[in-house]
Amino acid sequence: MCKQEYVFRGLGISLSGRGRVPETESMEPLPLIVAIHGGTYSSRYFDVPGYSLLDRAQAQGLPIFAIDRPGYGISAPYAAHAPSILDNAEILDSAIQDLWHNYPHNASGIVLIGHSIGAAISIAIAARQPSWPLLGIALSGVGLDPVSASKDKWNSVPAQQALVSVPPEAMDGFFFGPPATYDHAVMPQASHAACSPAPRSELVDIGMHWPKQVYRLAAQVKVPVHYRQPEYEQLWPVDEATVQRFAQAFVNCPAMDAALFRDAGHCIDFHRMGEAFQFQQLAFARRCVANA
């Protein structure tokens, strides 16, 4: 499998990213996986050595791409346009359509894996009923309404500041669980390579507008959903009941697999249980193909 960096095109906007492409064509129907990162991280979130979803997909022979969203990577200047969650969905819908038609494959369809704001965007993409074959969405680090402290933090950033840079050390306190849940020899330091300035607009949007949009968007999702919310989540209220309330918003979803994920914080991937979590997501992607 070939490990490469890529440039994707969405509504005429160039978006950077990375991927793993099988070197030989499989006779087995496979999902084409597209990973969508959250706020303050680039697509490298999914490719931190030792914690890489891309590497684990590669080990299973699954084609996978992670796209730098508008305002990240080579499209960082686009942050000046104040992209919202819905803007992200529209642009990425176009970029994924381009990917689907230009990548030579025998994939049965596409499965989105979205984290945090990337999970909200994945829901918004699914709600658009895209023209390319969407088979399912796997979500984590998102809910119905963020905690008040998270909203207040971003609202205080001046509106004229297009990009927000958060010191990695400050992010660690919000994104990781208790010390026993991650390997101190590696994390959180290794995650800092994936940190990136984020468009202020999306950070405000997830707190101010997402709670008003989520029920409408979730009701328009008509593909299977895999949802895991970490036990030590600090950006969203979390317990078994809130996980189920979120799942119940997907009233037209044909299959829902929702659960509280133990022993991890917001960035589940970077915890000791990250490998098990990613295996669950990849297994879900395969089930989407089997049930298509």
Spell out what each predicted region is.
Residues 1-25:
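N-terminal cap/lid segment of alpha/beta-hydrolase-fold proteins
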Residues 40-53, 239-241:
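The serine-hydrolase catalytic nucleophile loop
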Residues 89-108:
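Conserved acidic catalytic loop of the alpha/beta-hydrolase fold
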